[in-house]
């Protein structure tokens, strides 16, 4: 019965998404369709409305709109050029200087803006012209830009990790933020390895001359105000000075002060940023509320228990189960955005992982890492197609190089999946778990 209900949910969800129905409505309709055989329609609709309201009224949810607003302000604040110069001053002597600079800057910019697509667009456009002048293959630079754009979604502050905290029933945001650093750095390092190998093969050199400490100092001072946002907000949250919600509000104030000091926005552009952020936040908040319906339906019909029994019926080896889950998440992430996928798969797979002793922290990083790979994979792959557009190239030319990045990034996923310390060492060291 439970497996049949799950198949109904997935089938209805896929059909509605194929027809172009917004993901929030598709989740609600598919969930209600699955439960109508068990309870009365009026009761189902009333309960669904209550669950949606409860999901949207969580105080901790306000952190997401604030971080979205702070990210959009910073995105318009002209910080990309400062970060590119800062990373170039550090990594510029490596082979393929512009490739590794792109990777390092994407990690920093993605963490600040909270958007892989924004990182791919802002940083990629900064790197593109210089890469063209130095004879870099546009397909190589586009692939590097796209592949590295999602590393910032793992490095805090991360809306994806906040969403997972809500979906998992209140996992510590501070612990998740601390846990995100090593997986995010692993992603960036995997990309750097591929980038350097490509640079050596294709003959892309580093910047000539000796390491310039003076230039590094100048670039650090110019980038420090932007980097301080991460230090102040994350340091305050992890140190217990303020909560994630309070930290998100502080991030907005900090971003506003910085943007006005840089004179990169005015009142007119600020209003547009606020409106755009409100639209984006409205979609996310409503999606979180609607996902409560799905969680209720799964719990009512005991779907997680049935899925666990099904997987354990195939094998009792937890490593094989984790591999199966990774494959499911990787495939799902290719056609589903990160936020709805987190809300759908957390109630489905988290109980299974907890049954063999995995922490909610580790599962959260496995989940987000998988879905970030989907964000750079066709057919949807938002960050991938932004990178291709910015790079002025085509999917067919980029994919051979993307395959190399996929191999390296998935190797990083296996580290996150099978070595708990990758996700838990820092939170444990900081006394957060």
Pin down the residues of each PLM region.
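Alpha-helical transmembrane segments of multi-pass membrane transport proteins
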Residues: 1-433
């Amino acid at each position: 019965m439970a497996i049949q209900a799950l198949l109904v949910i997935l089938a209805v969800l896929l059909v509605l998404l194929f027809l172009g129905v917004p993901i929030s409505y598709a989740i609600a309709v598919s969930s209600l369709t699955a439960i109508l055989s068990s309870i009365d329609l009026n009761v189902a609709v009333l309960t669904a409305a209550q669950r949606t309201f409860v999901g949207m009224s969580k105080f901790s949810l306000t952190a997401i709109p604030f971080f979205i607003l702070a990210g959009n302000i910073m995105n318009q604040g002209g910080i990309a050029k400062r970060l590119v110069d800062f990373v170039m001053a550090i990594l510029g002597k490596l082979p393929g200087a512009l490739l590794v600079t792109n990777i390092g800057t994407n990690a920093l910019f993605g963490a600040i803006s909270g958007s892989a697509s924004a990182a791919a667009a802002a940083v990629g456009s900064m790197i593109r012209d210089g890469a063209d002048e130095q004879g870099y293959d546009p397909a190589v630079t586009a692939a590097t830009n796209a592949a590295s754009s999602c590393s910032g979604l793992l490095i805090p502050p991360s809306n994806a990790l906040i969403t997972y905290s809500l979906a998992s029933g209140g996992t510590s945001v501070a612990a998740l933020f601390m846990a995100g650093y090593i997986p995010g750095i692993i992603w960036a390092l995997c990309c750097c390895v591929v980038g350097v190998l490509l640079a050596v093969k294709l003959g892309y050199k580093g910047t000539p001359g000796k390491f310039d400490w003076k230039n590094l100092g100048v670039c650090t001072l110019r980038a420090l105000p932007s980097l301080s946002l991460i230090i102040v907000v994350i340091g305050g949250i992890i140190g217990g000075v303020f909560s994630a919600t309070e930290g998100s509000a502080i991030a907005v104030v900090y971003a506003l002060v910085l943007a006005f000091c840089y004179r990169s926005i005015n009142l007119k552009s600020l209003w547009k940023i606020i409106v755009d952020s409100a639209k984006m936040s409205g979609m996310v908040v409503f999606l979180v509320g609607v996902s409560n319906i799905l969680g209720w339906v799964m719990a009512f019909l005991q779907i997680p228990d049935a899925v666990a029994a099904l997987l354990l019926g195939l094998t009792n080896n937890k490593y094989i189960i984790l591999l199966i889950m990774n494959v499911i998440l990787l495939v799902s992430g290719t056609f589903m955005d990160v936020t709805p996928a987190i809300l759908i798969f957390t109630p489905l797979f988290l109980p299974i992982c907890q049954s063999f002793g995995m922490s909610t922290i580790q599962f959260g990083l496995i989940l987000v890492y998988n879905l970030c790979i989907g964000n750079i994979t066709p057919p949807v792959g938002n960050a991938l197609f932004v990178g291709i557009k910015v790079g002025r190239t085509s999917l067919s030319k980029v994919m051979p190089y993307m395959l190399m990045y996929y191999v390296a990034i998935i190797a990083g996923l296996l580290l996150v999946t099978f070595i708990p310390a990758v996700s838990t060492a820092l939170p444990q060291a900081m006394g957060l778990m």
